[in-house]
């Protein structure tokens, strides 16, 4: 028996998350590890669950995630984006709720490149008057 899988791709900074929603009990698995084991900070766990809480589907789906690149914050944002996109495949009536909360928008903010003559993107070398 083939169970229905709903797929969504999420991106944030340099992280890319491939998210699958499977009808289940609400278990979230990231890179074959439980969410509590993978994400240490409670705030990141809240970020990941936001789309499910907004659409009141926390205990209706198991979330399987494969995420690569970036740090934990970027990965949590990418997972949130992916879950929101996958929820649209489940039911398109979730769109107004997810859109108003801003979960469907790809956050365009990226790391600014380092410029030559400077120590970092904008940090200049110390100025000496004399």
UniProtKB/Swiss-Prot annotation:
Keywords: Ribonucleoprotein, Ribosomal protein. SUPFAM superfamilies: Ribosomal protein S5 domain 2-like. One of its GO terms (biological process) is translation. Signal peptide: none annotated. Pfam families: Ribosomal_S9. One of its GO terms (molecular function) is structural constituent of ribosome. GO terms for cellular component: cytosolic small ribosomal subunit. InterPro entries: Ribosomal_Su5_D2-typ_SF, Ribosomal_uS9, Ribosomal_uS9_bac/plastid, Ribosomal_uS9_CS, Ribsml_uS5_D2-typ_fold_subgr. The keyword Ribosomal protein applies. PANTHER family: RIBOSOMAL PROTEIN S9 (PTHR21569), SMALL RIBOSOMAL SUBUNIT PROTEIN US9M (PTHR21569:SF1). Belongs to the universal ribosomal protein uS9 family. This is Small ribosomal subunit protein uS9. The lineage of its organism: Bacteria, Bacillati, Bacillota, Clostridia, Lachnospirales.
């Amino acid at each position: 028996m083939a169970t229905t899988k709903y797929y969504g791709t999420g991106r944030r900074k340099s992280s890319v998350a491939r998210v699958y929603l499977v009808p289940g009990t609400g278990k979230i698995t990231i890179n074959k590890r439980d969410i509590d084991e993978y994400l240490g900070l409670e705030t990141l766990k809240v970020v990941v669950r936001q789309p499910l809480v907004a659409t009141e589907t926390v205990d209706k789906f198991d979330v399987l995630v494969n995420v690569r690149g970036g740090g934990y914050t970027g990965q949590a944002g990418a997972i949130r984006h992916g879950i929101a996109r996958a929820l649209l495949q489940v039911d398109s009536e979730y769109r107004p709720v997810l859109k108003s909360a801003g979960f469907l928008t790809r956050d365009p903010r990226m790391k600014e490149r380092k410029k030559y003559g400077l120590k970092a993107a904008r940090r200049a070398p110390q100025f000496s008057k004399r």
